[in-house]
């Protein structure tokens, strides 16, 4: 799954530390999500979308076969 977390984070002026704090996760979790090494749980993905005031589908993109 591709994602645009880094793009949205920078657009909103958040550091990785600040986003992690807002989501109550570690900075390493944010790094792993941004690098595509970790797919967040549904609740975490929904919270990320809520923070950026958008829908999950705008941030997380399913890779086409």
Residues covered by each model-derived region:
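Short N-terminal alpha-helical targeting/association segments
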Residues: 1, 20, 26-29, 49-50
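Short basic helix-loop element that most often maps to the first helix and adjoining turn
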Residues: 3-22
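Short, Lys/Arg-enriched C-terminal cap helix and immediately downstream tail that follows
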Residues: 8, 42-43
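DNA major-groove recognition helix of helix-turn-helix/homeodomain DNA-binding modules
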Residues: 44-58
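Short, charged recognition helix plus adjacent turn
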Residues: 61-65
């Amino acid at each position: 799954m591709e994602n645009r977390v880094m793009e949205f984070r920078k657009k909103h002026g958040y550091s990785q530390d600040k986003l992690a704090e807002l989501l109550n996760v570690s900075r390493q979790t944010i790094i792993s999500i941004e690098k595509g090494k970790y797919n967040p749980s549904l609740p975490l993905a929904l919270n990320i979308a809520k923070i950026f005031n958008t829908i999950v589908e705008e941030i997380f993109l399913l890779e086409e076969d």
